[in-house]
Amino acid sequence: TLYRRKSTMARKMKTMDGNTAAAHVSYAFTEVATIYPITPSSPMADYTDQWATQGRKNIFGNTVKLVELESEGGASGAFHGSLAAGALTTTYTASQGLLLMIPNMYKVAGELLPGVIDVSARALASHALSIFGDHQDIYACRQTGFAMLCSNSVQEVMDLGAVAHLAAIEGRVPFLHFFDGFRTSHEIQKVEVWDYEDLKEMCDMDAVAAFKKRALNPEHPVLHGSAQNPDIFFQVREACNPYYDAIPDLVEKYMNMVNAKIGTDYKPFNYVGAPDAEKVIIAMGSVCETIDETIDYMLAKGEKVGAIKVHLYRPFSAKHLLAVMPKSVKTISVIDRTKEPGSIGEPLYLDVVAALKGTEFESVKVLNGRYGLGSKNTTPADIFAIFANEDKAGFTVGIVDDVTNTSLPRIETANTAPAGTTSCKFWGLGADGTVGANKNSIKIIGDHTPMYAQAYFDYDSKKSGGVTTSHLRFGKTPIKSTYLIDKADFVACHCPAYMNKYDMVQDVKDGGTFLLNCEWSPEEVGNHIPGQAKRYMAEHNVKFYIIDGIKLGKEIGLGGRINTVLQSAFFKLANIIPEDEAIQYMKEKALASYAKKGDDVVQMNYQAIERGANEVVEVPVPAEWKDCKDEVLGEQAVSGKPEVLDFVNNIQKPINACQGDKLPVSTFKNVIDGTFPQGTAAYEKRGVAVDVPCWNSEGCLQCNQCAYVCPHAVIRPVVMNEEEKNNAPAGMKVTPMTGMPGYYFTMTVSVLDCTGCGSCTNVCPGNNRNDVLKMASLETQMDEQKFFEYGLTVSDKPEVLEKFKKGTVKGSQFVQPLLEFSGACAGCGETPYAKLITQICGDRMLIANATGCSSIWAGSSPSTPYTVNKAGKGPAWGNSLFEDNAEFGFGMKLAQDANRAALKNKLDEILASTDNADVKAAIDEYYATYEDGEANAKATD
């Protein structure tokens, strides 16, 4: 459609993601890299560091000097200093990290220093944090004086990244080169790669020499950054105008140099579509690829549509925009990937409106819309809706806004991807290796066949054990489908528990293939999958296969790492490349990956590859499955506070069923400011562990060390009196309590919340003599769940705490943990400490949580693991930023001090005016315990 003409030079093809492409290009022009990691930009700095360590040379014949600072603010300060002293400098960042760089960006731009910031554009924290992609961060920089260049795909990151550096060097204006976080930064594509010699040929070495000559140097000293007074500041600020006026033409010049080398047609603004288009979309970022694909489909139907892809956003060149605008246009829709509350329109829209003013296009209708916030999936159906929209301004796509009615309804249609595109979708469990295996698969196919390949990985925010879906596409032409796969030729479910949680078989196209990893035989499997899945397979001629990856992994010695087994099964069934070739390529990858770990590990992976291909079993799909009825996936929560139940049933459960995209805006009317109820993680019951602890009362020392170290608070001691013991469910193991005559002890396990880490069995001292705690298959331990639930109903025993003391390892575990079932990794080392604190003083805690790992396992929507006790008290949790947590917490303390002081003043007034002895006694007790938190809490009950 747009760019690729016959190339005038051959470049190597490699399979890589956008971050790798950006790092490859930036390394060529970089002498110093000052960095601080932040998702999703971190891999760019990682690759730069790795290549420098390996001795890779830039185009100047030197290795890059990379330094990690204490924060993005520090990285930007060093970025400024390095440029000022004459080194071509690059940094990599996103989101909050980019915001911390803004003060230095003004300085760098004001001093006309040719630095480059590569940004994997990401949402900013507002009502909630989002690590996912949109343009909020880069728009916050549009006033800094940096030129801003956008790449819409992995290939464009490779191609246009060079333009940012080349134009910065000659033009003396720093560049912010950005591309969409995750959708481009982490999307893997087969791309053409620059050779550094070709980049060197385009670089203006005289401009490099001039830059170094202007640098701070005691051999020819100058002063940068003086303080100026009102008499001259304004004039000097305006004196830089010629440099900015020259940038659009300079960018065009270097784009033309790139075009001449590689046969492309890059421009500051690129038009695609009908030459006589009447409807035009203007956008920038990865959505342009989806728009391009959709336009191809619509042109084949004879529709007069087109799109303008923005590459050079700052300086915004009206001349270059107007040069590509079709004269026939009647309606322009400008879509922004950001939200500016209170503005008359988002930034790109306002720029376009201003650019059209006073031109032949001034009377053309210009509509504005928002899309894609926080990586919201934007599909061809949304693009059809935008083209169909005649009048609605301020619209949104990709959501249902039933509150302010901004949304356009999607217009579903046929598959817009080019004929011959094969799509595959994999449902995995976070940290089970599925994503890594699919990265290998895409690289095998991309690097060893002439096919184009694309891979994108969709995650939830759990640190591990969450849902991951891998989206792979293969085809004979470049793949522009920058949206999630809806219907796939091949679907695999790597976690059998998902079958009763998610509608995933419905992802398979008619006649497609479904692979299930499970321990069930072909005869049994039909008893374990829901009716709607069976009916869909029968009605849509789906080929059904199973493999017991868990059993194979254990037999081979790989444990729960089933990724290699299932990768081999995929190549066996998908018919993308010959099976024998795939096996050979997989073995080569295994050797390269594991050779350092010894031949035994390599041979185990070879076995996994061979057996994965050989032990796939086809399951006949009987005709009677067409008569199967729908089954409910996930039960409604029925116990708890009304506001919690409302949240769990109407928000949490749909999100956890991967149906969150379907929730309308009105669903969130009670949580618009990001306030969520505590304790909702307890309603998930994910059942993701393969093996869970099995407690044997004989030989148990009742030391509670297992509960003490449990990262997810799933194993808990319970003390019962005689009546509670007698009322316990049949089969519950109970033993007399040591040191407490008349009381009974049991250890309960919430097997559906367990992650199977084995920390409890590792620490158990009783295992030295007996199998007090051992790991057993989840399916054999399902009765333990009702025992755990019963344990939650027994009465508190203050006398037990009096005996064993809350300040001891044993005694602390008789207190309800107010952190439970978090999204932390199996075996996490952080959560046991946080859990313990809640057992000591959780009912009167305010938590200021810095952004990072602990904020993700503690506050990832929609599951909140901090919970409340039977009195409804528990930790109140808040998050501000990564860099200000001490101050944020200090602010909480100041508020508490102020509120308590105000209360004390009110009590002083009451005390002075009352004769009620009970009131006076209560106030006196409050005063007497004022500095003792626990005692004061009791005084206020």
Regions found by a protein language model. Name each.
Residues I131-G181, M205, G358-G372, E539-I546, ...:
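Conserved thiamine diphosphate
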Residues K12-G18, P315-F316, T331, I335-E346, ...:
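Active-site cofactor/cluster-binding pocket
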Residues E252-V400, H471-R473, L484, A488-F490, ...:
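Thiamine diphosphate
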Residues V32-E68, K261, P275-D276, V280-H311, ...:
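Anionic-ligand anchoring segments at beta-strand to alpha-helix junctions in alpha/beta enzyme folds, i.e.
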Residues A582-I583, A595-C754, T761-L846, A850-T940:
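Ferredoxin-type iron-sulfur electron-transfer modules and their immediate structural context
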Residues V32-I35, V64-V67, S82-L100, P114-V119, ...:
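A short, small-residue-rich loop immediately preceding and capping a beta-strand
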Residues F60-V64, F175-N270, E631:
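Conformationally flexible catalytic loops at phosphate/diphosphate-handling active centers
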